[in-house]
Amino acid sequence: MKIGVLALQGDFREHKQMLEALGVEAVEVRLPKHLTGVHGLIAPGGESTTIGKLAAEYGLDEAIRERYACGELAVWGTCAGAIWMAQEIIGYPDQPRLGLMPIAVRRNAYGRQVESFEEDLEIQGLDRPFHAVFIRAPVIERVGEGVEVLARHGDRVVFVQQDRLWASSFHPELTGDTRLHARFVELARG
Protein backbone atom coordinates (compact mmCIF):
# COMPACT_ATOMS: atom_id res chain seq x y z
CA MET A 1 0.00 0.00 0.00
CA LYS A 2 1.41 3.34 -1.08
CA ILE A 3 -0.08 6.72 -0.16
CA GLY A 4 1.01 9.91 -1.87
CA VAL A 5 1.13 13.34 -0.29
CA LEU A 6 0.77 16.31 -2.64
CA ALA A 7 4.10 18.07 -2.07
CA LEU A 8 3.72 21.30 -4.03
CA GLN A 9 3.37 23.58 -1.00
CA GLY A 10 2.09 23.43 2.56
CA ASP A 11 2.50 20.95 5.40
CA PHE A 12 3.03 17.79 3.37
CA ARG A 13 5.95 16.59 5.54
CA GLU A 14 3.69 16.26 8.59
CA HIS A 15 1.21 14.08 6.69
CA LYS A 16 4.07 11.94 5.42
CA GLN A 17 5.34 11.47 8.99
CA MET A 18 1.88 10.42 10.19
CA LEU A 19 1.65 7.79 7.45
CA GLU A 20 5.16 6.52 8.16
CA ALA A 21 4.25 6.23 11.87
CA LEU A 22 1.56 3.77 10.72
CA GLY A 23 4.12 1.77 8.73
CA VAL A 24 2.65 2.94 5.42
CA GLU A 25 4.85 3.74 2.43
CA ALA A 26 4.40 7.47 1.86
CA VAL A 27 5.68 9.29 -1.21
CA GLU A 28 5.83 12.95 -2.14
CA VAL A 29 3.81 13.74 -5.27
CA ARG A 30 4.92 16.70 -7.39
CA LEU A 31 4.37 15.41 -10.93
CA PRO A 32 1.89 13.01 -12.57
CA LYS A 33 4.56 10.29 -12.79
CA HIS A 34 4.77 10.28 -8.97
CA LEU A 35 1.19 8.90 -8.85
CA THR A 36 2.36 5.55 -10.23
CA GLY A 37 1.42 2.81 -7.78
CA VAL A 38 -0.25 5.27 -5.39
CA HIS A 39 -3.63 4.14 -3.98
CA GLY A 40 -4.47 7.26 -2.00
CA LEU A 41 -3.48 10.93 -2.13
CA ILE A 42 -3.54 13.51 0.66
CA ALA A 43 -3.70 17.18 -0.38
CA PRO A 44 -2.35 19.13 2.61
CA GLY A 45 -3.07 22.46 4.18
CA GLY A 46 -1.15 25.46 2.90
CA GLU A 47 -2.23 28.06 0.38
CA SER A 48 -5.07 26.81 -1.81
CA THR A 49 -4.45 29.25 -4.69
CA THR A 50 -0.79 28.21 -4.95
CA ILE A 51 -1.65 24.51 -4.75
CA GLY A 52 -4.28 24.92 -7.48
CA LYS A 53 -2.01 26.89 -9.82
CA LEU A 54 0.94 24.51 -9.45
CA ALA A 55 -1.20 21.37 -9.80
CA ALA A 56 -2.67 22.75 -13.04
CA GLU A 57 0.72 23.86 -14.36
CA TYR A 58 2.26 20.42 -13.76
CA GLY A 59 -0.76 18.50 -15.09
CA LEU A 60 -1.40 16.89 -11.72
CA ASP A 61 -5.03 17.96 -11.47
CA GLU A 62 -5.99 16.14 -14.66
CA ALA A 63 -3.94 13.05 -13.75
CA ILE A 64 -5.64 12.90 -10.33
CA ARG A 65 -9.11 13.28 -11.86
CA GLU A 66 -8.38 10.45 -14.31
CA ARG A 67 -7.06 8.10 -11.61
CA TYR A 68 -10.06 8.84 -9.38
CA ALA A 69 -12.54 8.35 -12.25
CA CYS A 70 -11.02 4.92 -12.95
CA GLY A 71 -11.47 3.90 -9.30
CA GLU A 72 -7.72 3.78 -8.75
CA LEU A 73 -7.33 6.60 -6.23
CA ALA A 74 -8.81 7.84 -2.96
CA VAL A 75 -8.23 11.54 -2.21
CA TRP A 76 -8.27 13.45 1.09
CA GLY A 77 -7.98 17.22 1.20
CA THR A 78 -7.18 18.89 4.53
CA CYS A 79 -7.77 22.64 5.02
CA ALA A 80 -6.38 24.20 1.81
CA GLY A 81 -6.56 20.74 0.24
CA ALA A 82 -10.29 20.64 1.03
CA ILE A 83 -10.72 24.01 -0.68
CA TRP A 84 -8.84 22.69 -3.73
CA MET A 85 -11.14 19.62 -3.88
CA ALA A 86 -14.38 21.65 -3.86
CA GLN A 87 -16.44 22.26 -6.98
CA GLU A 88 -17.26 25.74 -5.66
CA ILE A 89 -15.05 28.15 -3.72
CA ILE A 90 -17.39 30.88 -2.48
CA GLY A 91 -16.15 34.33 -3.51
CA TYR A 92 -13.35 32.92 -5.70
CA PRO A 93 -15.01 31.58 -8.87
CA ASP A 94 -11.78 31.72 -10.91
CA GLN A 95 -9.47 30.04 -8.39
CA PRO A 96 -7.85 26.88 -9.85
CA ARG A 97 -9.24 23.76 -8.20
CA LEU A 98 -9.40 20.00 -8.53
CA GLY A 99 -13.19 20.24 -8.21
CA LEU A 100 -13.89 16.57 -7.51
CA MET A 101 -16.37 17.03 -4.64
CA PRO A 102 -19.82 18.58 -5.00
CA ILE A 103 -19.30 20.92 -2.06
CA ALA A 104 -19.14 24.69 -1.66
CA VAL A 105 -16.36 25.92 0.61
CA ARG A 106 -15.74 29.32 2.19
CA ARG A 107 -12.05 30.13 2.62
CA ASN A 108 -10.80 31.45 5.99
CA ALA A 109 -14.32 31.18 7.41
CA TYR A 110 -13.06 31.19 11.00
CA GLY A 111 -11.03 34.35 10.52
CA ARG A 112 -7.36 35.22 10.41
CA GLN A 113 -4.32 33.41 11.82
CA VAL A 114 -4.79 34.87 15.32
CA GLU A 115 -8.29 33.38 15.43
CA SER A 116 -7.01 29.84 14.85
CA PHE A 117 -8.04 27.31 17.53
CA GLU A 118 -8.13 23.68 18.62
CA GLU A 119 -11.27 21.73 19.44
CA ASP A 120 -12.28 18.16 20.26
CA LEU A 121 -14.65 16.88 17.56
CA GLU A 122 -17.04 13.96 17.50
CA ILE A 123 -16.27 12.27 14.17
CA GLN A 124 -18.49 9.58 12.74
CA GLY A 125 -16.73 6.22 12.94
CA LEU A 126 -14.30 7.17 15.73
CA ASP A 127 -14.80 5.78 19.23
CA ARG A 128 -13.66 8.94 21.04
CA PRO A 129 -13.28 12.65 20.20
CA PHE A 130 -10.55 13.78 17.82
CA HIS A 131 -8.48 16.83 18.81
CA ALA A 132 -8.68 19.01 15.68
CA VAL A 133 -6.47 21.98 14.83
CA PHE A 134 -8.15 24.78 12.85
CA ILE A 135 -5.75 27.29 11.23
CA ARG A 136 -7.44 29.95 9.05
CA ALA A 137 -9.83 27.12 8.38
CA PRO A 138 -12.45 26.89 5.65
CA VAL A 139 -16.04 25.83 6.27
CA ILE A 140 -18.04 23.55 4.02
CA GLU A 141 -21.13 25.70 3.42
CA ARG A 142 -23.07 23.34 1.16
CA VAL A 143 -22.88 19.65 0.36
CA GLY A 144 -24.18 18.04 -2.80
CA GLU A 145 -25.93 14.78 -3.42
CA GLY A 146 -24.11 11.74 -2.07
CA VAL A 147 -21.90 13.74 0.30
CA GLU A 148 -22.02 12.52 3.90
CA VAL A 149 -21.23 14.84 6.81
CA LEU A 150 -18.74 13.14 9.16
CA ALA A 151 -18.19 16.01 11.62
CA ARG A 152 -19.42 19.45 12.58
CA HIS A 153 -18.00 22.21 14.74
CA GLY A 154 -21.16 23.63 16.26
CA ASP A 155 -23.48 24.02 13.28
CA ARG A 156 -20.63 24.28 10.74
CA VAL A 157 -19.69 21.32 8.55
CA VAL A 158 -15.96 20.56 8.84
CA PHE A 159 -15.50 16.98 7.55
CA VAL A 160 -17.27 15.22 4.67
CA GLN A 161 -17.01 12.07 2.57
CA GLN A 162 -18.28 11.11 -0.86
CA ASP A 163 -17.31 7.66 -2.06
CA ARG A 164 -13.47 7.60 -1.85
CA LEU A 165 -13.14 11.36 -1.32
CA TRP A 166 -12.64 13.12 2.02
CA ALA A 167 -12.46 16.84 2.77
CA SER A 168 -11.68 18.22 6.23
CA SER A 169 -11.40 21.84 7.37
CA PHE A 170 -8.89 21.00 10.08
CA HIS A 171 -5.28 19.77 10.26
CA PRO A 172 -5.21 16.14 11.53
CA GLU A 173 -1.48 15.90 10.80
CA LEU A 174 -0.65 18.37 13.60
CA THR A 175 -2.14 16.29 16.42
CA GLY A 176 -0.08 13.11 16.75
CA ASP A 177 -3.37 11.15 16.55
CA THR A 178 -3.09 8.75 13.61
CA ARG A 179 -6.68 7.44 13.67
CA LEU A 180 -7.90 9.44 10.66
CA HIS A 181 -4.79 8.65 8.66
CA ALA A 182 -5.31 4.95 9.45
CA ARG A 183 -8.95 5.18 8.29
CA PHE A 184 -7.87 6.91 5.08
CA VAL A 185 -5.37 4.12 4.39
CA GLU A 186 -8.24 1.62 4.75
CA LEU A 187 -10.40 3.74 2.41
CA ALA A 188 -7.58 3.77 -0.15
CA ARG A 189 -7.11 0.03 0.24
CA GLY A 190 -10.68 -0.31 -1.00
Which role fits each region the language model picked out?
Residues 48-122:
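Cysteine-nucleophile active-site neighborhood
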Residues 1-69, 178-190:
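N-terminal beta1-alpha1 cap of cysteine-dependent amidohydrolase-like domains
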Residues 26-27, 75, 165:
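Hydrophobic anchor at the start of a short beta-strand
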Residues 38, 71-73, 95-96, 129-130, ...:
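Short coil/turn connectors at secondary-structure junctions
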Residues 43, 77, 168:
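Redox-cofactor binding/interface segments in oxidoreductases and associated redox assembly factors
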Residues 107-190:
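Amide-donor transfer/coupling interface in amidating biosynthetic enzymes
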Residues 12, 35, 84, 91, ...:
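Flexible, glycine-rich phosphate/dinucleotide-binding loops
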